[in-house]
């Protein structure tokens, strides 16, 4: 599982980046923090996309931090707990 956190100054690039993460299976945890729980191939492709398409467009203050996190060692509190539970509809 990856946790992606970003700080991008320009609205257009930030929106495009956010949509790209969602398109690749990311779930928003907070405003600029996403969780990606996908196959290793998809996660590696995502990092290539970031490096090739977004990093060259970054301004001096822009940043993306990617954490490779073990789901076993992850601890969630508050609203984040409910995101992992199944929803049953009748």
Where are these regions (language model features)?
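A general marker of short, structured functional hotspots
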Residues: 2, 13, 27-30, 50, ...
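Short acidic, gly/pro-rich beta-turn/loop elements at beta-sheet edges
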Residues: 16, 44, 76
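C-terminal structural segments of small proteins and small subunits
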Residues: 55-90
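Extended, hydrophobic alpha-helical segments
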Residues: 1-41
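Short, intrinsically disordered low-complexity segments
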Residues: 29, 36-60, 73
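Short linear motifs at secondary-structure transitions and domain/linker junctions
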Residues: 8-12, 39-45, 63-65, 85-86
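Short, charged/polar low-complexity linear motifs in solvent-exposed/disordered segments
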Residues: 22, 46-48, 84
